[in-house]
A protein has these predicted regions:
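Mixed-charge, polar/low-complexity N-terminal
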Residues: 5-6, 11-12, 85-88, 126
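Membrane-proximal low-complexity regions enriched in glycine and acidic/polar residues
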Residues: 24, 28-82
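Short, mixed-charge, low-aromatic patches
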Residues: 14-24, 71-79, 104-108
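Charge-dense, low-complexity intrinsically disordered segments
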Residues: 3, 53, 108
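Internal alpha-helical transmembrane segments
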Residues: 1-38, 132-153
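Exposed beta-strand-loop-beta-strand "reactive/processing" segments of non-cytosolic proteins
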Residues: 74-98
Length: 153
């Protein structure tokens, strides 16, 4: 490939990904400066007798049923287990935390602020499609850096 094609490819990739990189730099910089965002938590009443078996083979279906029984219409891509609780993912938008307690199940609705949502995307906790975009962006950034270095020499 001749030099002009490399320059055009480099500039196109750089121009396309600059807005994304600016958002990543801003969200990461604000996080490091202590602006981590916030999450508004609301406890949701759970039906009497609701239970949650964290070792269930049908955990996704169990959680979907528990949410539906509580009157919550929510689609999630996967669950993250931690201790005696489960978190629906992605956490870059409204999500739910279900905790197994001695009294049954505690469900809490979590609504992240814009900054918290940006941090969650930055950490890779966004939707699966966005994660694929991030992988592509990482390759494009590597291309921009290497081609820029090579073209500058």
């Amino acid at each position: 490939m001749n030099r002009s094609v490399w320059i055009k490819a480099h500039l196109f990739a750089a121009a396309f990904f600059t807005p994304v990189l600016v958002v990543i730099a801003i969200s990461g910089g604000l996080y490091l400066l202590g602006f981590k965002g916030s999450v508004e938590e609301t406890t949701i009443p759970t039906p009497a007798g609701a239970s949650l078996n964290l070792d269930s083979d049908t955990l996704d279906a169990d959680v979907a049923r528990l949410l539906a029984d509580a009157g919550i219409s929510h689609e999630f891509e996967y669950l993250r287990a931690g201790g005696n609780s489960l978190t629906t993912r992605p956490t870059s938008t409204t999500y739910y935390v279900l905790a197994a307690t001695a009294d049954g199940v505690k469900i809490s609705k979590q609504v992240p602020s814009l900054q918290k949502s940006m941090i969650e995307l930055h950490k890779g906790h966004g939707p699966v499609l966005f994660k694929e975009f991030q992988k592509f962006m990482a390759l494009a950034l590597l291309f921009v850096l290497l081609s820029g270095t090579w073209l500058g020499l």
